[in-house]
Regions:
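Glycine-rich, acidic and aromatic/proline-enriched surface loops and short helix-turn segments
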Residues: 122
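Soluble periplasmic/extracytoplasmic beta-strand elements of cell-envelope proteins
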Residues: 104-106
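Periplasmic c-type cytochrome electron-transfer domains
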Residues: 2-74, 94, 108-115, 131-141
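Periplasmic/extracellular electron-transfer cofactor-ligation site
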Residues: 73-100, 125-131
């Protein structure tokens, strides 16, 4: 009985703290003020795990096809360089102001292809990463 009572009290306290945090606006929503380390880690871990779970069963096409590489390079130059940069481009107006900062893909190296495809297709909420799959067929992503 003590366990149930303690669990209910702790659960209720957690709900009150969470509701108070939301109601009193304790988490700053502005992109010009970074999250606390704890909030950033929670968001980052949640995002990474959610993408991994959803990308786990994707079948990745042969990424060594020269035509696919050429098409991908053109799409990247047209739609991605402004935020994710390219070799020889250190920063842009857009890459300087986004929070969280988009990864510099020229320095990051090759990401997991299935996860990269999922992110490009579906985007990431509240990050500035567009869901390109809403107006591009999978063959172009």
């Amino acid at each position: 009985m003590n366990f149930i009572k303690s669990s209910l009290i702790l659960g209720g306290a957690g709900l009150l703290i969470g509701a108070g945090t939301i109601y009193f606006g304790l988490i700053h929503p502005g992109a010009d003020e970074p999250h606390s380390a704890l909030v950033f880690k929670l968001i980052e871990t949640t995002r990474d795990r959610a993408i991994a779970v959803r990308a786990d069963d994707l079948v990745v096409p042969a990424l060594t096809d020269p035509a696919m590489i050429k098409q991908g390079a053109g799409n990247y130059a047209a739609m991605c360089v402004g935020c994710h940069l390219a070799p020889g481009i250190e920063s842009t107006e857009m890459s300087k102001i986004l929070y969280p900062a988009p990864p510099n893909l020229a320095k990051l190296g090759a990401p997991d292809p299935a996860r990269a495809f999922w992110v490009i297709k579906h985007g990431v909420k509240a990050s500035g990463m567009a869901a390109w799959g809403t107006n591009m067929k999978d063959d172009y992503i």
